[in-house]
Design a protein with these regions (language model features):
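Cytochrome P450 proximal C-terminal region
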Residues: 2-17, 43, 163, 190, ...
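Cytochrome P450 I-helix active-site segment
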Residues: 37-47, 51, 156-160, 213-221, ...
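Conserved, non-catalytic sequence blocks in retroelement Pol enzymes and Pol-derived host proteins
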Residues: 39-43, 57-60, 128-131, 147-156, ...
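Cytochrome P450 heme-binding Cys-pocket and its upstream "meander" loop
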Residues: 61-69, 293-305, 402-451, 461, ...
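Classical protein tyrosine phosphatase
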Residues: 89-99, 106-108, 204-213, 315-341, ...
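Cytochrome P450 heme-thiolate monooxygenase catalytic core
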Residues: 111-119, 135, 153-322, 338, ...
Length: 501
């Protein structure tokens, strides 16, 4: 059976502890099909139970797997009731296009769960800020100050230095033979790489409290991903108290913010002693705060909440995506040999991988780091594929299901890892993987693939003690990001020398 993980423990505890307490408030949920209140044509969905709604349909599988199976029975636009939260699940290209393009303004905001209220300081970050003037202000700062092409390119040397440091560490592991041979745990190594790159871009140097900070990032992901009572029954204060989830979220936020406080204080002291701030992201935010003139002045908690976003997005998703890419290559030796040969042929003259030689690479169809895209919320009543979506409905796009839909991925099983799908002459060669084609909604590509390509260029890889790599365990873990359940320990074999080693 697929991983049910600790997230479902919350469901079990909730069923036991809340059923009696909330029984007096029990209402029979209206069937999420046909016509609802006011003659609305609501999307179809599975039958519900009092209090828990549709939760019993999700237990025993990973949520994105269970939702894909339910959508096969009820359709690509499906209404669930997760606890007391009405949730629209979108599982087709056409439905995703209507939601994210045709009615993008209606779905432009995100819901804030009890845990997210705590972690984001009541939605003061760019990712979860409610749609409105404050969000537009943050987006303008991101587009015109933080993420300009010039600024991103200015950090190229940081990326290259950190990738080189990782390659040297892997080369050292490859030197051992026999009993002395060492392995590399890929997700940990790649996540650490992404964290170090992010830290240097944000602060100007590596975060000396990296391990503690990463632990808080991991804890945050666990807290926001689980089916916990505070988020399932937001109208019940008792649910939050019973679960203790809000208290744990506060502890996680406070620990992470204390680390950021120390770093920010160092940057402020450096700016005072040097007479000018640097060009790192923290300096930019502090400069904007000092200059003022904003409609909504930036408080220090606003700055810390947005830095927390940058680290969460910059390290967790990159490490997860690259670990899956390596696992798929290991499990498909023919594809691995072809990819390695092409990479070495492309960069042979240079002797190393550089960003100049990279195109955008569609790698994340089977394993999008966010299998259920970050939730949105319907701001105003609208219709999707002919169904009415009431205001306040939470919306989830099942990107994992879109990437495995046989209607969009002909030429073999959609579960098959076959990069040739994107080559010229293939039916799917013209698919745009930057978000224009809604059957494929990956979470990135481009520069972040540089570390993975460098690992193929310099090393061959093998799974210690495994004669048949096609048997590699590919089970996913429960969480907001779809990590591998098992660590990926690989043995590197040096094939192209690493500069500086």
């Amino acid at each position: 059976m697929e991983d049910a993980s600790h997230g479902y423990v919350y469901v079990g505890l909730a069923l036991v502890s809340l059923f009696v307490v909330l029984l007096a408030r029990r209402r029979r949920s209206p069937p999420p099909t046909a016509h609802g209140d006011g003659g609305l044509r609501l999307p179809p969905g599975p039958w519900t139970l009092p209090i828990i709604g549709s939760l019993h349909h999700l237990v025993g599988k990973l949520p994105h797997h269970a939702m894909r199976d339910l959508a096969r029975r009820h359709g690509p636009v499906m209404l669930l009731r997760i606890g007391e939260v009405p949730t629209l699940v979108v599982s087709s290209r056409d439905a995703a296009r209507e939601m994210m393009k045709t009615h993008d303004m209606a779905f432009a905001t995100r819901p804030l769960s009890a845990t997210l209220h705590v972690i984001t300081c009541d939605g003061r970050d760019l990712v979860f800020a409610p749609y409105g003037d404050y969000w537009r202000q943050l987006r303008k700062i991101a587009v015109t100050e933080l993420l300009t092409a010039r600024r991103v390119n200015s950090y190229r040397s940081i990326r290259e230095e950190e990738v080189a440091a990782m390659l040297r560490a892997v080369a050292a592991a490859a030197e051992g033979t026999g009993a002395a041979a060492r392995t590399v745990e890929m997700r940990a190594a790649l996540t650490a790489l992404s964290t170090d790159i992010t830290a240097r871009a944000v602060f100007g140097n590596r975060c000396k409290d990296r391990e503690e900070y990463l632990a808080q990032v991991d804890h945050t992901i666990e807290l926001t991903a689980g089916f916990n009572p505070a988020d399932l029954w937001p109208s019940s204060r008792l649910a939050g108290r019973l679960s203790g989830i809000v208290r744990r979220a506060e502890e996680c936020r406070d620990t992470a913010f204390k680390i950021l406080d120390r770093i920010i204080q160092e940057r402020l002291e450096m700016a005072r002693s040097d007479g000018a701030a640097g060009e790192y992201l923290i300096d930019v935010l502090l400069r904007i705060q000092k200059e003022g003139g904003l409609q909504f002045p930036l408080a220090m908690d606003d700055i810390k909440a947005n830095i927390f976003d940058i680290f969460g997005a910059g390290s967790e998703t990159s490490g997860t995506a690259l670990a899956w890419a390596m696992a798929e290559l290991i499990r498909n030796p023919t594809v691995m040999r072809k990819a390695t040969a092409e990479v070495r042929r492309a960069f042979a003259a240079a002797g190393a991988v550089s960003e100049d030689g990279l195109g955008e690479l569609p790698t994340f169809r089977l394993h999008p780091p966010l299998p259920l895209l970050l939730p949105r919320e319907c701001r105003e009543p609208c219709r999707v594929l002919g169904y009415d979506v009431p205001r306040g409905t939470q919306v989830l796009v099942n990107a994992w299901a879109l990437g495995r839909d046989e209607r969009y991925w002909p030429g073999g099983s959609p579960e098959e890892f076959r990069p040739e799908r994107f080559e010229d002459g293939e039916a799917t060669a013209a698919v745009n993987f930057r978000g224009a084609d809604f059957e494929f909604l990956p979470f990135g590509g481009g520069r972040r693939m540089c570390p993975g390509i460098a690992l193929l260029f310099h090393f061959d890889w093998e799974v210690p003690g495994m004669a048949d790599p096609t048997k590699l365990d590919m089970t996913e873990a429960f969480g907001i990001t779809a990590r591998r359940k098992a660590d990926l320990h690989l043995r590197p074999l040096l094939r192209v020398s690493v500069p500086g080693v």
